């Protein structure tokens, strides 16, 4: 079937057949390790279209849902059957540094045909995910990601009322297939990142789910898009927020503004108690008209509970702002930005060398992972990073190994209670201060999670000793 690319965001529920979310499957080896294989697999991304060749974990994109309880040990044997070296990063987990999965900083990339064993304990309950962390712009963009759900010791919601929703956007060609030839476009690296023209949920095009009226559901939304910030409005179906980036709020809240911006790599847990006869949809709102990408049908009143269990806070150390050390981070570069004074691999970047190296962005004048750390903090020290975005583009900033609070943000309000996050969106020409206790020893990455931006220079690191 031939589809005009301009039609993708005009097509709504009528363009797809009703379906349910596919179950997740994974294989445990005899020694108790969960085996995750990076392999190519055929998968259909658009209704009635030919399959696309994706890079997957265990044959599907997203890969298997890993679901464990807080405090449990996770053991994963990663086997790389692709032609590129790879690794797995466990996004949002306050993990032992050696298990963080960052080539060049915490481990060597796993070469084709080789394997690596990850072994760690999950300290925090919540919604997390795992993904490739070598050439992420290419590997995540082709499908190397999956959900990691850490349940409370006594799960707040049973399996029927706890739904994981992995949201991705794909750039499809006119045949409805993944557009491989568009990967690595220089404009994506220097502008807003790679944006797709079709949305899937758990790898499925416009799924439809059934809920029972009057029962409480937890919807775990995970944005795995390379660069797209999803514009959502939970208030359209009376949803409340339970958690940001895996960290629960003291009580569910109603968003005081719309749209809610869910940037690349961020997660949000929604509380929904559907009403009889009131079907609703998750919609992306950035276009001229809402684009529904997941529909919920509400059936007869159920016999389950509408009671909302209280989610206990995770054991995060509170920043001591009075004793904090402040570290300025100036973000420069990108299209319509300034490039003066940027260095890459110790040499000044001119226009020609910038185009050849594809390094368009910089932190404090340095493009890409530098030899010298951004800062060193003593274990237990409170750190404030003051980020100044002197570019024309927003950025989804992610801190590895820690969660932080946004303490100050120029030009916009801070969410009530300064909720914990591991990724935040900083707007053009905006200054934002984040604070956290550097209590996890090791070398930790700080980067933009708009993956083309990270590849094009927006990566640095700090050390906790």
Segments the model singles out, each with a brief description of its role:
Residues 1, 7-27:
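N-terminal export signals
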Residues 11, 23-37, 140-172, 250-394, ...:
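Extended terminal and domain-junction accessory segments
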Residues 50-67, 197-208, 358-379:
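N-terminal edge beta-strand
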Residues 63-66, 97-127, 134-137, 256-261, ...:
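Aromatic/His-enriched, Gly/Pro-containing loop or helix-boundary segments
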Residues 78-82, 222-224, 387-391:
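Asparagine-centered strand-capping/turn motif at beta-strand->loop junctions
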Residues 99-100, 108-111, 182-323, 409-415, ...:
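Histidine- and aromatic-rich segments of cupredoxin/plastocyanin-like copper-binding domains
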Residues 236-248, 390-419, 451-455, 463-465:
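Active/binding-pocket-proximal capping segment
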């Amino acid at each position: 079937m031939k589809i005009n690319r301009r039609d993708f965001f005009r097509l709504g529920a009528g363009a797809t057949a009703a379906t349910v979310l596919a179950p997740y499957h994974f294989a445990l080896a005899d020694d108790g390790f969960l085996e995750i294989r990076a392999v190519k697999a055929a998968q259909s991304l658009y209704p009635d279209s030919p399959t696309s060749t994706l890079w997957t974990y265990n044959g599907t994109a997203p890969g298997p849902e890993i679901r464990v309880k807080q405090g449990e040990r996770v053991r994963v044997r990663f086997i790389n059957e692709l032609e590129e070296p790879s690794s797995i990063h466990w996004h949002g987990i306050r993990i032992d540094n050696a298990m963080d999965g960052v080539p060049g900083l915490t481990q060597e990339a796993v070469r084709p045909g080789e394997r690596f064993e990850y072994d760690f304990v999950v300290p925090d309950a919540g919604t997390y995910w795992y993904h490739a962390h070598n050439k992420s712009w290419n590997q995540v963009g082709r499908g190397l990601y999956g959900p990691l759900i850490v349940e409370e010791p006594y799960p707040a919601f049973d399996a029927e009322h706890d739904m994981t929703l992995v949201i991705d956007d794909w750039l499809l060609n006119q045949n409805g297939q993944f557009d491989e030839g568009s990967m690595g476009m220089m404009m994506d690296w220097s502008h807003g990142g790679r944006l797709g023209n079709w949305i899937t949920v758990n790898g499925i095009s416009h799924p439809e789910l059934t809920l029972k009226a009057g029962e409480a559901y937890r919807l775990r939304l995970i944005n795995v898009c390379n660069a797209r910030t999803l514009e959502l409005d939970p208030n359209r179906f009376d949803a409340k927020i339970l958690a940001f980036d895996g960290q629960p709020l003291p009580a569910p809240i109603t968003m005081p503004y719309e749209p809610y911006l869910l940037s690349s790599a961020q997660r949000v847990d929604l509380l929904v108690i559907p009403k009889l006869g009131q079907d609703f949809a998750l919609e992306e709102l950035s276009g001229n008209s809402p684009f529904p990408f997941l529909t919920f049908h509400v059936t007869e009143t159920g016999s389950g509970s509408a009671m909302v269990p209280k989610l206990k806070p995770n054991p995060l150390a509170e920043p001591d702002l009075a004793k904090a050390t402040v570290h300025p981070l100036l973000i420069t570069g990108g299209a319509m930005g300034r490039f003066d004074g940027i260095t890459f691999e110790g040499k000044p970047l001119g226009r020609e060398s910038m185009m050849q190296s594809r390094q368009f962005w910089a932190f404090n004048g340095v493009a890409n992972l530098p030899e010298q750390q951004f800062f060193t903090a003593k274990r237990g020290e409170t750190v404030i990073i003051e980020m100044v975005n002197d570019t024309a583009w927003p950025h989804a900033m992610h801190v590895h190994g820690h969660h932080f609070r946004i303490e100050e943000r120029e030009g916009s309000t801070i969410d009530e209670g300064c909720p914990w996050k591991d990724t935040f969106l900083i707007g053009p020409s905006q200054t934002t201060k984040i604070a956290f206790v550097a209590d996890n020893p090791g070398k930790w990455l700080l980067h933009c999670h708009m993956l083309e931006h990270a590849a094009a220079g927006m990566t640095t690191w700090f050390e906790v000793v």
